[in-house]
Amino acid sequence: MKHLIHYFFRKSLIIAIVFMLTMMQLTAQTDSIANLPQYLFPNFDTSIVRLKTGELFKAVMNYNTLTERMAFYQKGTLLDLVKTETIDTICIQNRLFVPFERSFYEVILNAPVAFFIQHKSDLISTGRPAALGTTSQTVGITSVSKLVGTRNSYNFKLSENFKIKPYEVYWVRMNNEMHKFLNENQLLKIFTAKKHEIKIFINQFNLKVNKTEDLVKLASFCNELFR
């Protein structure tokens, strides 16, 4: 009996140690892809994916602003989500994303006048060493499409010769048409019939279209105007 108890104790201990080592390895692997500048979120996080069939599943995901692809972490490997036509929505850290062609836009307000943010970034060469310790930046912005192959190396840590410059593009969907804007003036041109009222609202509350919380207020106001 004592031998049996000792056997089960040793077996339980081995299982516990293997489990702990597995968790430590997983943590180390996810830590290695934390705080990478090309990603929208600091960490890969458990996300909810809804398919167009209504099926739900979970995946550890983040959004790569450089390639404009959803990246997911599976069995120690980073992969791109390529079958975007099957996706309805993805929820990451309580923020909702919908597919547009092969990329994803963040939903600011899903309404008759819908607002979205397209999160992007440029890959900037930091240059090569020049005379007297200076740096040459003549290379400038690099086309990612020329650099990314079937296995996307830009899901991982980038070379020190490059840096990421993030920016946003804003979209309005109205009457099933998408309209792009980058600033307040471009937004007002989309709503020519109501631009006076929108301008007053922006000035009254000192809103900035490049601040998400302000854009939510502005989106709600625009929907009230077009009821």
Role assignments for model-derived ranges:
Residues 1-32, 218:
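Bacterial Sec-dependent N-terminal signal peptides
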Residues 57-179:
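Aromatic-patch recognition
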Residues 167-199:
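Flexible, solvent-exposed short loops/turns enriched in glycine
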Residues 52-54:
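Glycine-centered tight beta-turn/hairpin loop motif at sheet-sheet or coil-to-beta transitions
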Residues 188-227:
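Long, compositionally biased interface segments
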Residues 30-46:
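Short N-terminal segments immediately surrounding and downstream of signal-peptide cleavage
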